Amino acid sequence: MSDKDPANSRIAIKFGASKAPLRPSPASALGKRARPHLLGGNASDSESDGEGRPADRAENITTIGAGADGRGRDTGSSKKPLTIPRQANRDWKSEKRARTNTTSTRQQADKEVEPVDQGKPLKWGLTLKEKGAKATEDAGGQAGEASTDQSDADKGADAKPEKTADEEAMEALLDEREDKKKRNLVIARAESAGAKEEEAFKQNFRDAPDVSTLEDYEEMPVEEFGAALLRGMGWDGKPRGPKTKDVKRRPNQMGLGAKDLKGQEDLGAWDQKGSSRSRPKRLNDYKREERERQDKRSHRGSESYKQERDRERYAAVYLGLCGRSRPSTGHRFMYGNAKISRQLMKD
């Protein structure tokens, strides 16, 4: 360590901002200039992605993914109404007919392929030999051609005697009748329930529509599903039926039956018909007015009676003073006025 020069082994570390280059970078072909860094220097290579963007520009990220470039843009193309094609109704009768035909075809194929031992009858218990036509033909084949009388005699010999009623009853009890022995009874094989269910599942699987994909679900909004079904069935898109009443929320502090004033309030227009239309009278007011009218009528009647008596008395006094038995027309007019009569009495 002592052999080495201590000046060469030193490491110099300097803190500070990067120095500006002596020569500015030339302008690019696109006409953009290199923008200075916020701290005074030029932007580094790691910040080349943000070059060309203003420092005060705000960006909002709305979509993240592969299709982010086209999702936020408005294509401007008019969207066609969505339509779901109508599927044909299921024909139960034809399905049942086809299922029946398939079952009958399978049974017929099973009958055509006979098992090996089907022609041989099962034997058990006491077995009796049956005289068949083959033994008769073999015996007669060696003799050659026989006469007609001999053949008739052989047929008569081979013919069985007629059975009596007792013998037929005995055979019926013992269940040994020949028609039952010769009869071949066949019981069709019953298909298992599992085979039927499997065939039905295969048929439904073949007739089922294609499975919807995720793209189909994304293209069909939930609120448009019912309208799309109706369009597939022939709906023209026009609403039918009675129009529903649009319920609107009332403004604040507006009661039932009140109407919103669209213009300014006209205070003078509130009582335009107030002079001609008065409020109905109350019972107390009506009774008070009726009493006043009655009082006026009674008072007027009493005054008129008094005035009439006064006029008669004044007329009698005047006639006595004048010496006349009947007043003239002018005097009658004067008698009608009480004040004039009083003045005459004073005179």
Curated annotation (Swiss-Prot):
Function: Involved in spliceosome maturation and the first step of pre-mRNA splicing.
A Pfam family that the UniProt record links to this protein: G-patch_2
Superkingdom: Eukaryota
Keyword field contains Nucleus: yes
InterPro entries: Spp2-like, Spp2/MOS2_G-patch
Positions of the UniProt region annotated as Disordered: 1-219, 231-310
Entry GO CC: spliceosomal complex
Known partners and oligomeric status: Associated with the spliceosome.
GO BP term, pick one: mRNA splicing, via spliceosome
Family membership noted in the UniProt record: Belongs to the SPP2 family.
Identification of the protein by name: Pre-mRNA-splicing factor SPP2
Biased composition (Basic and acidic residues): 50-59, 88-98, 128-137, 152-166, 194-209, 282-310
Subcellular location: Nucleus
Keywords: mRNA processing, mRNA splicing, Nucleus, Spliceosome
